[in-house]
């Protein structure tokens, strides 16, 4: 099996509560290599562009407002089955429905303030990685 890459965001609520280290440690303990990472403060235009697929949905404006409210940590994670395994690790979007032991069950505050984002497919991962990183910023180990 070959290595895959997935995209992760540690969202404003988790950054504000100083959970970056704890969440990154969970990624590494689960076998992910962090091959790129950086802190970003999104502009409204960047947030709207990243979440363009949700434009017109009832939650879109609140999502954009939330994502520009504080810095985020974007990262590229690598391992076999990265997309599927990362989605399992972070748990359901709604932390009330997330399984015990998942990142969202442990750290998320609510459906809106759910601490992390993860790509839902290899195609999404490629698009999301390219939105934030150039190739030279990704360093396989």
Curated annotation (Swiss-Prot):
One Pfam entry name: NDK
UniProt-listed InterPro entries: NDK-like_dom, NDK-like_dom_sf, Nucleoside_diP_kinase, Nucleoside_diP_kinase_AS
Enzyme Commission number(s) from the entry: 2.7.4.6
CDD domains according to UniProt: NDPk_I (cd04413)
GO BP term (any one): CTP biosynthetic process
Residues at the catalytic site: 117 (pros-phosphohistidine intermediate)
Gene Ontology cellular component annotations, sorted alphabetically: cytoplasm
Main location: cytoplasm
Cofactor: Mg(2+)
Compartment annotation: Cytoplasm
Gene3D superfamilies associated with the record: Nucleoside diphosphate kinase-like domain
Any one GO molecular-function label of the UniProt entry: metal ion binding
Similarity annotation: Belongs to the NDK family.
Name of the protein described by the UniProt record: Nucleoside diphosphate kinase
Gene: ndk
């Amino acid at each position: 099996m070959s290595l895959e890459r997935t995209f992760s965001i540690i969202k404003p609520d988790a950054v504000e509560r100083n959970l970056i280290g704890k969440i990154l440690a969970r990624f590494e303990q689960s076998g992910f290599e962090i091959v790129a990472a950086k802190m970003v403060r999104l502009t409204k235009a960047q947030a709207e562009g990243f979440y363009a697929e949700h434009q017109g949905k009832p939650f879109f404006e609140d999502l954009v407002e939330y994502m520009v409210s504080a810095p985020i940590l974007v990262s590229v994670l690598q391992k076999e089955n990265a997309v599927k395994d990362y989605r399992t690790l972070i748990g359901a979007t709604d932390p009330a429905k997330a399984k015990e032991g998942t990142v969202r069950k442990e750290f998320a505050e609510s459906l809106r303030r759910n601490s992390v984002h993860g790509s839902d497919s290899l195609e999404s991962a490629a698009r999301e990685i390219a939105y934030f990183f150039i190739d030279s910023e990704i360093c396989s180990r």
